[in-house]
Each structure stands twice: as C-alpha cells, then as structure tokens.
Amino acid sequence: MADQDQLKALRLRIDSLDEKLLELISERARCAQDVARVKTQTLGEGEAPVFYRPEREAWVLKHIMQLNKGPLDNEEVARLFREIMSSCLALEQPLKVAYLGPEGTFTQAAALKHFGNAVISTPMAAIDEVFREVAAGAVNFGVVPVENSTEGAVNHTLDSFLEHDMVICGEVELRIHHHLLVGETTKTDNITRIYSHAQSLAQCRKWLDSHYPSVERVAVSSNADAAKRVKSEWNSAAIAGDMAASLYDLSKLHEKIEDRPDNSTRFLIIGNQEVPPTGDDKTSIIVSMRNKPGALHELLVPFHNNGIDLTRIETRPSRSGKWTYVFFIDFVGHHKEPLIKDVLEKIGQEAVALKVLGSYPKAVL
C-alpha cells in the first residue's frame, strides 16, 4: 500500500511538472512570434526577413548542453530542444527543405535531425535537383550527403558544387545502421535477391559474404526504393535503416549488419545565406591548381605555416581543362577571421581559381 501511495505522489508531481513545462514551452513559442514581428517591422525596403539563423541555433544547443546536469545525456537534451526550436520556428516561418529522396532515406533522417520535424521536407530524385531547388528559391535549404566514413566522398555532391553557386550553411553527422528488412509475405528461408543502394551494399559487403554469399545483390537508386520493392516480392530482402523500416512497415530480419560499427555519413546544409562566425566553425573551399609537381604542397603550406587544421581534402578532375585539378578542402575556422583571410589570400595568389563554399558551425548533434 505504501508503494502505491508513493507512486501516486510521484505521478502527481510529474503531472504538475508537465503542466509547468507546457506553460514554459507556450511562452517560448509566443516569444518566437514576437521575434518574427520585430524582424518584419525593422526591415528596410526590399529586404526579406531571415528567420532561421544557423549560428543562433548552434549557440543555443551548445549552451543547453553546457547547462545540462543529467540524468539525460547531452545529445538527448539537445534533441529535445531541437524539436522545441523547430516547432517555434514554424510559427515564425515554416522552413522548406529539399533532400535526396525518396522518403525513408538517410538524407531525410539527416534533414530531420538538423531542422527538427516541424519543417516541410521535399524529396528530390537526384542530388543535382536539390541544388536546383535551392538556387531557384523553391525551398529555403537543401540537404545532401558529402562523405561516408567507409566509402569516402560522394562525387555527385562535389560535382554539383562545381556547377552551382551555393552556400554551405551547416553540417550534419549521422551514424548509419543498416538492417536486413523483409515484408510480411517474405519467405525468409528462401531469399534469392537483396536490394539496396550501391554504397550500402558496399558497407555491408563482408556481412553479406558471410551470411548470404550466393544471393543476388541488386543496386537501386536508394535504400528507400529497395524497401518499397520488398513489399511486393516474397523472395527478396532490402538493406535500409530504421526510417525506411517504419515507413514501409517492414520487419528487421537482422539488425546492424554494417561491416564497421563506426559507419557514419556527413551531410551538408546548402542555402543562399552566409552564416556569421560562432567561434567554433568550419570552412569549405574549392581550389583549382595546375597539374604540376608540387602543386598540392604549395596549396597546403599556408595552412601548415598558420597552424590551421585541415579536416578533409578531396581531389576531382576539373571540367574546364585536362591539365587542371580541383581540390575540395574543409578546415577549422571562419573565412571572416583575419588569420583565415590572410591564408585564403596567399592560396588565391597561387591558384588558378579559389571559391569559398561557405563557413558554418561545426555539427552539434
């Protein structure tokens, strides 16, 4: 009886806390509406209000994580506040975000992780279409994959940066877990075909060699497409993630079958607005150099001499001429910082061409 009384008292306390939480969240939402009104009223002629500020969101999430004393871990607390901010921002202006579709892809999961579930997300059939939607102003932002820890760079994304003038506004890192999914009618002891995206098949190669060595592996346009195909076939399975399993009502025959447990993909947020410095930023650039001995060394010397950390470097052949190569470089810092400005100026003196793709806050989640 005493235990029941204690449970009742604790539940009453939770109910009271929930009421207070609701009151505070509602107050925050009303404050967001006030922010929208102030921004709109202070605009100059011909100016459009900027409601989503990546640097502000990054600061809020980091601040909350610094204040957190548990028992929820920092990432869980940050996710809760991300959703609160997403819902409040939707009251100011619902964000439209394009991503590499269809529904159920890891790119959609990355978009929702970064922007929260209150955004209007639109699937695109190809990476280049995401760039075009953003360039045309049909959406506010786009989300595209740029590199995987197992398979390396996503060349379609790198090539799209050569063709479009886009600004990188943020990054998202997503831990990738692959599952072998089956439908209600699948005869699991007679699977003869496994569908997935080519990169996912590659990321699960060893597991497939061990468990399904003689089964046909079919590369399709996306993991979500693989999941859709399984719904109508009794002898096939798909490799995809949690979102696709839930969306297409599939069961997990085997979970987490990726060869590397640290398998992750990095995604970029592209838009049309520059992001101010936060003090904890990355910058991405494209540099075109002549194909001559020592070209890469010349490019890297200014970074080394000024103690600037490079986080990624990729090489692609230039489309403008067979004697030119293009380097995609990510490094720590913001292009508005004096030291970074000096380094970029030195690089520009040696390069055929230099383009700053954007400076943006490091991934918080």
Curated annotation (Swiss-Prot):
UniProt GO BP: chorismate metabolic process; L-phenylalanine biosynthetic process
Limits of the Chorismate mutase domain: 1-96
Main location: cytoplasm
Alphabetized GO MF terms: chorismate mutase activity; prephenate dehydratase activity
Annotated binding of substrate, by residue: 11, 28, 39, 57
Reactions this protein catalyses: chorismate = prephenate; prephenate + H(+) = 3-phenylpyruvate + CO2 + H2O
Pathway(s) where this gene product acts: Amino-acid biosynthesis; L-phenylalanine biosynthesis; phenylpyruvate from prephenate: step 1/1; Metabolic intermediate biosynthesis; prephenate biosynthesis; prephenate from chorismate: step 1/1
Prephenate dehydratase domain: residues covered: 97-272
Site (Essential for prephenate dehydratase activity): 265
Keywords: Amino-acid biosynthesis, Aromatic amino acid biosynthesis, Cytoplasm, Isomerase, Lyase, Multifunctional enzyme, Phenylalanine biosynthesis
Localization terms from the record: Cytoplasm
Record-linked PROSITE patterns: ACT, CHORISMATE_MUT_2, PREPHENATE_DEHYDR_1, PREPHENATE_DEHYDR_2, PREPHENATE_DEHYDR_3
Annotated Gene Ontology cellular component terms: cytoplasm
Catalytic activity, EC: 5.4.99.5, 4.2.1.51
SUPFAM superfamilies named among the record's database cross-references: ACT-like, Chorismate mutase II, Periplasmic binding protein-like II
Residue ranges constituting the ACT domain according to the UniProt record: 284-361
Physiological role: Catalyzes the Claisen rearrangement of chorismate to prephenate and the decarboxylation/dehydration of prephenate to phenylpyruvate.
Protein name, UniProt field: Bifunctional chorismate mutase/prephenate dehydratase
